Amino acid sequence: MISGFANFIANLKNEFNSDYIVFALDSKGKTFRSDIDPNYKANRPEPPKALLDQLPVCIEMIEKMRLCSFCQEGYEADDIIASFVKKYSKNMQINIVTHDKDLYQLIGENVRVYSPAKKMLYDRDGCFEKYGVWPEQVRDFLGICGDSADNIPGIKGIGEKGAKKLLENFGSLEKIYENIDNLPQNRQKDLLIEGKENAFMSKKLASLYDGLEVPDLLGAEFPTENPLLKITEILKEYNLNRILSALENSKDTDKTLNFKAITVSTKAQADKILNDLENVKEIAFDTETTSVDSHNAKIVGFSFCWDEKSSFYVPLAHSYLGAPDMLDKNMAKRLIEAIYTKFIIGQNLKYDFRIVRNNFGLNPPAKYADTMILAWLMDPDNSVGMDNLAKRYFDYDTIKFENVVKKGENFSSVDVKNAANYASEDAWITLKFYKKFCGILSTELLDLAKNLEFPFIKVLLNMEENGIKMDISSLKEMINEIAEQLKILTNEIYDLSGENFNINSTKQLGEVLFEHLGLPAKKKTKTGYSTNESALSAISDLHAVVPKILTYRELYKLQSTYTEPLLALALKNDENRIFSNFLQTGTSTGRLSSKNPNLQNIPAHGSMAVQMRNCFVSKDGFSFVGLDYSQIELRLLAHFSLDKELLRAFREDEDIHSRTAISIFGTSDKEKRAVAKTINFGLIYGMGASKLSNELGISRSDAKDYIEKYFKAFASIKNFMENLKSEAKKNGYTTTLFGRKRYFDFANATPMQFAMYERESVNTKFQGSAADIIKKAMVEISPFLNENARLLLQIHDELIFEVRDDISESFGKKMQEIMQNVVKLNVPLKTSLSINKRWGDLK
């Protein structure tokens, strides 16, 4: 908690850019709500002792940082916030930082709620989108469906969906009861009549009191100096070394960090810059556009900086009434062509390269560096966003996008002068990032960036632009088939459970399974019964409805997450191709991640996985060529551990899972091989006996016995794993095959975090090293790609190409050779090659 709170303080100014800050604190003891209902908050479990011990430290931190806090006996922090809102919201914008949904009732014209978990600001529309009710209906909503966290009862039997529908029709709790005689005679009406007293009491409990006498804001000003500098002793006491390091960096920084923002809008200015550029070697470059979607965004302007004293902005397409003259696009292209002959520095260059290619037809430059990637190599678990980096390394508050661009508008509507300040700052701070990282990153990591991560940017750029074709008719057929199956399953579930309910509501589902049907449940939490996959799988043999629910969920997710969204995307493109975005810095291990849409999560297993993947097809005259590294993480285990038996098995090309099965069970039949496969891969991810017993459906003692036999068969592996964890604890990081580091704060970890860090330190070694290898393979493959052979997807250890039919086999074999020889390990790398017209048919 202390670490999290310190990080929260460190990011406050950066995230909110506020003039004032007030911490509202709960009072000790009972509040006036306990007089309304003695059971209010009565069932709350006692907070963990570690949390109770750390809370006073956090309050001490607030006091020592001289930040404003307020507490009122008999009232909750929420009431204090409501009173501040009432007093000040007419004249200033207020952001409420909270996890609690009851505070959404305070949202208004100048009041928004910020969710720390989602890192999102919610206004009136955001409240409706999140909860399905307007801010003024939040109290009514809680009056109906209650709030288990605070033991607010609500109306028993009416959940969130029912509450939303009632409020949509009637507007408020009072109006519902005014019209209750007009409601159809059904179970819901009976529940409303029976629960009326609870409903109005619950609404009263959920209503915030805003009549407290709160102080003025004198003394609540946001400090100009970093408040954490006042509590360095506390930070040292709790070993918050990363924060202390950032503070140390900020002390060494020139706090003025001034530069001159220059707007370039005439040919004469551009000609002078072209002349000045002749003596420039390195230049930071950034684009401003109409959208974050680089595939469709239009350029509005671009900025560049080479000496930290001045930074330039070239406006091209500002379209507001009264916008000044801007540089001719042909002249702008000449400028970019000249800039591209230099060493380019950018923050998320893949985006800028695509914008320039799409808007000017220019291919990326030969030499470049990306500070986002350098920041990620420095600390892969931390934010690599520009605003956060500026604050972390220079204690500098950048101009925020939302303070420049009005809601619902884009950068083209921004006044050119304001745009110049914002955009010029982006280029200027990017240049500073580059110089900073060149000074603090190790030579090994700088070399890794130069030789692997930077060239990989172009590989991803081209892969994303290729997209992949969808078979529209197959998708539609699948959508109809799933819809029909869901309809049948819904009726079967209703029949087996004896009632109709919202199957997608975890609350209603939990009540049906564990209360109405009486099935055994794990302990009920404040949010209700657990109905996740593992919880349902554990009781799937106890009632016929449970397997139906699991099948329903699988199909519903397939429909809502994949088939319907993919169809919508495919129909937007003339060739029915969809285009994903691959994130190079999206994971801590080094693996790529994919979004909009996430093509790496297309189901590979399940009843309809092949059918789903077969909706992805090659274009006419071309085939998919799939190349998949075989057991790469197990081969890395052999490489790192030097276990003699494992080395021998791979060198002799044995079936490693059969070999493991024989070592543990003395036989390698299909069933035993499957168990061995689970053990082989599970141990790499830090799986213990408890997890293995759940995975295999066996007793914990049997699972423990299997693991002991495994380590007996492969004697060196256990020592290697233990040494790997010990090194991570000693050094505070794990290193991958190519030298990337992932850091773990073992010193300040809770027991649960400590165990997680141990697992992740092992996982990162293998998953991160596998990511290194396939990235290097993709870079080495890229010179062989052209209009006849294009790389479409990377699915972790697998590459999928679209290749002209007549060369598909020879191309596949050539790529196979490259992939298998991209790095020299103590065991051979092996890939499987498959060629087909549909993704699902690749073996």
What are these language model-derived features?
Residues 1-97, 101-123, 198-215, 219-220, ...:
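Noncatalytic, basic helical substrate-engagement surface that gates or grips nucleic-acid strands
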Residues 1-20, 38-50, 59-64, 253-393, ...:
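Conserved RNase H-like, two-metal-ion catalytic cores of nucleic-acid enzymes
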Residues 42-53, 109-133, 189-191, 315-329, ...:
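Short alpha-helix plus adjacent loop in nuclease-associated cores
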Residues 112, 117, 134-137, 141-206, ...:
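Accessory alpha-helical DNA-binding modules that contact the DNA backbone or grooves
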Residues 191, 195-319, 344, 362-364, ...:
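Conserved "right-hand" nucleotidyltransferase catalytic core of DNA-directed polymerases
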Residues 412, 465, 572, 579-580, ...:
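Conserved catalytic core of nucleic-acid polymerases
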Residues 441-452, 456, 775-799:
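Active-site palm subdomain of RNA-directed nucleic acid polymerases
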Residues 484-491, 495-548, 712-765, 802, ...:
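C-terminal polymerase-core module
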